Amino acid sequence: MVPRSEDGGGEGHRCSSTPPEVRYEMRPLRYSINVTLDGCCDHRAIPADEDLHRHHTENLNQADALLFGRVMYEMMEAAWRPPAPTGSRPDWMEPIAQTINAAKKYVVSSALERVDWNAELVRGDLRNAVQQLKRASGKGLLLGGVKLPLALAELGLIDEYEFVVQPRLAGHGPIAA
């Protein structure tokens, strides 16, 4: 599934709401999600191939921190935190694994008591906490998941949206509402 913006080709298609020439006074909060034609964003319904991982690694390299809710943090930690058993994933997954492992992570959760894996809990008023993260110096924040992005969209805090549309129907799972 290669997202291609230059010619619209490939099996997946990237739709972004912000032109690359836009400059922000604060570091931008970017939201990127894979979604099927029926709006499903369940990672199990979307095959993760080499091109898709390469695209998401490029997105990760445009940010200096990741912002997750509890569910997304736990899912990403289970998938990417080292050590991965030998032979458990193809070599082409290593760049994204290394990038995610090295990234600073912020986790919005009232349920978790502590986090590690280069992560910090975000508590208190969501609007103020995220605005504070955006005011910090850096390249940007990359947001993933479903529930937290919905809350942040309602607060008007997301600066860029990217939907990587997968040409399939899932028929089940969470939807990007």
Please state what every model-predicted region is.
Residues 7, 18-19:
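Serine/proline-rich low-complexity intrinsically disordered segments, especially terminal tails, linkers
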Residues 1-12:
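Extreme N-terminal basic, low-complexity initiation segments
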Residues 19-177:
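Enzymes that bind and transform nitrogen-containing heteroaromatic metabolites
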